[in-house]
Each structure stands twice: as structure tokens, then as C-alpha cells.
Amino acid sequence: MKKILILPGDGIGQEVTNECLKVISYFQKDCEIEYTEDLFGGASIDVHGEPLTKEVLKKAMEADAVLLGAVGGPKWEQLEHNLKPEKGLLTLRKELEAFANLRPGKVFPALIDASSLKKSIVKGTDIFVVRELTGGIYFGEPRYIKEVDGKKVGANNLIYSEDEIARVARVAFEIARKRRNKVTSLDKANVLEVMQLWRDVVSEIHSNEFKDVELDHLYIDNAAMQVIKRPSTFDVILAGNLFGDIISDEVAELTGSLGMLPSASIGNKYGIYEPVHGSAPDIAGQNI
């Protein structure tokens, strides 16, 4: 028996997961699948006062997979940082150790006219973004907004350990072996020490374990330009949490719509599966 925890979340999330349930129900004819549904994100805040309760986290850790709709919306934007719907998602990823986010961005011939770029540029584009998901600046401590000498100061810390970098790099290289055998790692090693560590560790993993895979490195600002200029030349893109968050949305736009793409966040044991898009409150409830 396989167990799936369904967390519709907010906005269009309920409609999205309802459609997924039709697929799950179809496979129940031949597979033993049990699913439960619970509150998450803003929907959980409205009832329980927090985006992710201990009870829901326990259910997630007992499930074989988590199916997520979407979280967030204008209704909860003014809440304190640790009470926002997105905080529940960050905590869920961290607690399940879902350290690698996988996002494909493929331009299909039938949908090429939906792309914002010319056909001649996006034709043949098939990019797979591997984003480190449970480390980096989104989780680094200390983090604060405080007053110093009468002025507000905000700070976040961009921190990565060797192990955090190595494990997500291995995921990227393994995926590349099953595709076109190339990894492009993104960093800012020219100005950030932590990004120099990123580059060093990725290079070491490549040299010791994946010499058969082609590896190149790009600074994130140059990469953002090259993905627009020559998208079809990329295969697997490896990036840290912040850079991966940004570049994966850019890659998604090449395909024509962020709303049509899937996302998987995986670790050694757990997996979280969701659409790439947000809660889309402007069209929620319209069943489209």
C-alpha cells in the first residue's frame, strides 16, 4: 500500500489537486494507493494559526509522497515572516530533507508559438534545472530586521556546507547521464566565498565520480543572459537555492507558460510533487 498526502493549499491549489485525484483514482484500479487530504499554507493559518501544523508534518513523514497544490496569496502577505504560508513550504522541504528540486523546461514543437522568444532561438530547448532546496540564504542564520543606531538594518546569511553541495551535485550529474551528458553549474564565485566553495565542490565531485559528464561553470548574471540567448545549448543546470529559484522561472517562461510545468522536490526518502505555478488567486474558483 502506497500512501499519498494531498495538501491543496491556497488559491487554485484545490482545483489543481482535484484534477490529480482523477489520475490517482484511475490507477487505484491496478495499484494499492491510499490518500488523505489536509490543510496547508494560508488555509491552515486561517484554521490553526500556522501554515504547517505538527500533525500535518507527521502525516507527511509517514506518507510515501506529498502532492502539493499551491500556497500563498495577498490575504496573508502582511503576516510576520514566520507565519506566512511560504514558511510552511520551506519547513516542509527542510523537515523532509527534500534537498533537490527538479524542474524540466522543454519547448514542444506544438507549443513553440507560446514562447516569448523567436522560434529560431527556442527550437530544441530541453533544459532540466536541479536546484538545491534546503540550504543557502533561505535557511541561513542569523536572519533579522533590527534597528542599529536608529536605522533599520536587515540581514540574511548565505551558508552552504560541503555535504549540502556534494549531494545535490550528484543528483545533477546522475540526471545528465540519462540525458545529453552535460551539467552547467551556476555560481558567483568571483565575489562570494561560499560560491567559490560551491564551484570547488562541484568540480571535485565531477573529477572524482563523473568524468564522463561534461561540466562547465557560469556566473549567474551571465547564465541569465545565455539562457535567453542560446537556450537549446543547455542540458542540466545546477544551482543553489536562490539562483535556482530565479533561473528555473526564467527557463519555464521559455516554454510559454509557467503554469504548464511540473516540479519535484526529492531527498533520499521523501518526495514532494507540485506544479511550478503559484496560487493564482485571480483565477481561483473559476475551474479553469
Regions found by a protein language model. Give the residues of each.
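N-terminal beta-loop-helix "entrance" segment that forms/cooperates
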Residues: 32-54, 227
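Glycine-rich phosphate/nucleotide-binding loop
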Residues: 42-45, 227-288
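N-terminal glycine-rich phosphate/adenylate-binding segment common to multiple enzyme folds
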Residues: 46-155, 242-244
